[in-house]
Every structure is written in structure tokens, then in C-alpha cells.
Amino acid sequence: LDVNKNFITTWRVNANDKIVLPFIVDQYFQGNYNCTIDWGDGSETEHVGGKNSIAKRPEHTYSQAGDYNISISGKCSYFVLSANAYSSTYPELLKKLIKIVSWGTVEAGGYGFGDAENLVEIAEPTKKTFIKCEDDSFAYLFAGCKNLEVIPSFLFRYVNENTTSFEGTFERCEKLTSVPEELFENAPNATNFEETFAYCKNLMTIPTNLFANNKQSNNFKKTFAGCTKLEKVSYELFDSTPNAINFDRAFY
């Protein structure tokens, strides 16, 4: 597996489980997939997409229980567990994703891992990769990943500089105890931090300079609401956010 080029995720399956990848397959997303999938169990690789829209989401059945690395190379623009059409159809699959091993370079445009409740590990990007969201938003990207314990310090190292929203990005990540100080430093135009860490009920500390480079931010509504184990908050936390006007229930 080429961890530099491939988008690699780990899934924990039982014998005869079927994994269906959360591709968006309707006509409005034609041309957004032209990739090869290695299912990680020694089976033949599968090519998906091209000029025409794919007819259905890629799927694969595993004969034996275990943890399998699914590797995607090529163009994979959308991988959205939280899309209603996927999450409502395959709710059991949200529990089977356990790691993001590598982001690769797959021309990603919009990804979402909301309610992947057993996701425990997120890779740190090594190149400009999935972080170039077309809608300039990371809203609810990892919301409900309740077993995620650590956020990589430079997860958003290569963020689109025009990114404006981190609304609910880590909402309900219940095992987080701390947040890296450098997390948002490369998003100088971010304005919306509503519910970013809301209901992270084991969060104990917030770095003083978390928003030091987010001078355009104006919305901190419920940013840390429900963070009942916070030990203290620095008086200087919002010193670099002169445009902030909404602190409604920021620490409620």
C-alpha cells in the first residue's frame, strides 16, 4: 500500500460482512470518481468510475473476520458516511470504520465521517490532500466519533485558506481530553466555530492560543457547550478574535 498516494481506511468486520463504500453516485456527481480499490483481503482490485457516473456504490463481502485496510488510488472526490442516503441505508457500517491510515492524494473534494462511533485514529496529512473542500467548510466532519481520543496537531495543515466553517467539526467526540494548539492556525479566514467541540464531555483543557490566527472569526455559539469537565479557560482565549459577536452558550 502506498501511504503517500492512497487514501487508506481500516474497517473491522465479522465473517461474511459486506462493506459498502460511501461514494455519492447520483447524476450530479459524474466524473468525480476514477479510482482503483484494493479491498485488503487479497482479492482482485476493482476499478470504479471514469467519465460516466457509477451506477452503484462499490461493495465487497469478506469471508473472514478481521481488520482490513481498504486502499483507494486515483480520483475519489466524495467519501461521505454522514450523507443521509448512506447513513440511513447502512447504519451498521458506521460502526465498522476504525482508522483513517492515510489521506493520500485522491483529489478529494468533500469527505464526512460523522457518527463513525468506533473511529479511534485519524492520520495527519503529509501532503495537500483531502483538505480542499469545495464548499470551504468542515462542518460536522467528525461529529459523533465518540471513541476518537486524539486529534492530530496539523490535521488542517493544508486547509484551503478560504475555509470559513468548522461548525460542529468535533461535536460529540466524547473521549477527547485535549485539543492541539496548532489545529486551526492555517485557517485565517475561518469565521464559524459554532458547536465545534460541543458535548465533548471529557474535554479538560483548551490551549490559550487555539484561535490565535483566526482573527476573522465571529461565531462561537455553543463552541464548548456540554464540556462539563473543563478545568479552566484562559482569559486570553479570544484575545485574537476582535470580530466575534456571538458567544451564546459558548460554555453552557
Language-model region placement:
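Solvent-exposed loop and capping/linker segments of extracellular ligand-binding repeat ectodomains
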Residues: 1-252
